[in-house]
Amino acid sequence: MRAIAAVAALAMALMSCVTKPAPDLNRLAESYVRLSLEIGAHEDGYVDAYYGPAEWRTQAMAHPRSTAELKRAADALHAQIEAIESASAETAVKRRAHTLAAYVASARFRLDMIDGARAPFVQEAQLLFALTPEIKPLTAYDPVLARIDALVPGHGELSGRVAAFRARYVIPPDKLQAVVQAAIDECRRRTLQHIALQRNERFTLLLVTGHSWGAYNYYHGDNQSQIQVDTDLPSNIDDALQLGCHEGYPGHHVQGVYAERLYRRYRYVEYSIAPLFSPQGPINEGGGNYGVELAFPGAEKLAFEQSRLYPLAGLDPATAPAAEALAAAMNDLAGARLTIAQQYLDGRIDREAAVALLQHYLLQGRERAEKYARFIDQYRSYVINYVSGLDLIRGYANRAGPDNDAHWRAYLSILSQPTLPADLEP
C-alpha cells in the first residue's frame, strides 16, 4: 500500500506539471493528428492506435491530401510548433512543444519513405525514432556464443543443440492460452501494486496465425486492449511472462492507458493517436521489454515460473533454472539483430546471408530466422526499438535509484508526461 500511495503522489505531482492546454498548441496538435490520419490513408498500418473524434478519421480516409501536400503541411506545422517552443516561458509547454515537433519531423520523413526515399539504417532510425542505435560488430557476440556453448554441451552445430534444448520447454498448444493468461494475470497483479489503472481497463488474449510478428497489442481506447499471439511457431515457457509484461502490464496496454489519459484528462490532443513509426517507438517497445525485469526483479521471475507456469504447461519445474540460464545468456545476443538488419537493409548482404547470420548469431532455426527476416522486410529500422529502447529505459530507471520502487516511479514518470528518447539519456 505504501508503494502505490507513493506512486500515486508522484503521478499527481507529474500531472500538476502538465499545464492547461495552450490553445495555439492544441490547434497545432489537432493538425498533427489529422496529418497522421491522412498518412495512414497512404500507408496501411501507420496508425497503430486512434481514439480521437471518429469524424477526423472519416474525413482523413475520405479525402486524404497527396503526399506532396502532406509534406508541405508537415513542414509548415513543424515551423509553427518550433515558434511556440521558442516563445514560451513555461517549462511544460516547451517540453510538450519540443516533443510534438519531433513527432511531426518523424511523420515528415515517413512521407518521404512512402514516396520511395531510403536512408542508411542508422540515419533512418534517427529520423523516425529520434534515437541513435548502437551497432556492434558481429564479432562482439562471439564470446556470448562461447558462453552458450558451455551451457548446452554436446555434438553438432550450436544452433541445433540450442533448438533441441529449447524444444523441451515448448508450451503444448492445448495449454498455451491458459499459460499465457496466467502470466498476464500475474503481470497485472504486480503492476497494480505500483501503478493505478481505471476500473474499466481490460486486456484480452487472442491466438492467431500468419503474421511476421510473434505478438501484437491492439489498443482500442477506453482503457481496452487485445493482445494477439501468433502461433505459427511454438512458444516456449520463457515467452509467457515476456508476452504478459511486454504487451500488457506494465507494457503496451498500460502505455496506451496513460497516453489516453494525457488526451482525455489533460487535453493533449496529440496523444489521441499513436503512429507506429514515431519517437514513441523506443519508449514503448523498450518499456515493454523492460516490463519483465520491472515486474519480476531478481529471482522472482524464475520463482513464479517454477511455482505456477511450469505446472500449468505440464513441464518439470526442476528444470527451470537451466532454461533460465540459457534465456539470460541468449538475451545478450539481442544486439546482433541490429547489426544484421543494418547490413541487410544497407545492401551489404543479401537476404539469404541475413537469414544465415540470424541462424548463427541468434541461434534460430531456419523457419524462425526466415520469419524474423520478414519482420525486418516489413518494419525495417523499427527493430532498434526493442534493443536500443530497452537499454534506454533500463538505464533511466537504474539511474533513479537502486531499489525496485524507484524503478517503478521512473517508469511512471515516462508515461505521465510528453517524453522523447533524449529526455531519458544521461
Q: What is each of the regions a protein language model found here?
A:
Residues 17-426:
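N-terminal maturation segment of proteins
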Residues 5-13:
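Bacterial N-terminal signal peptides
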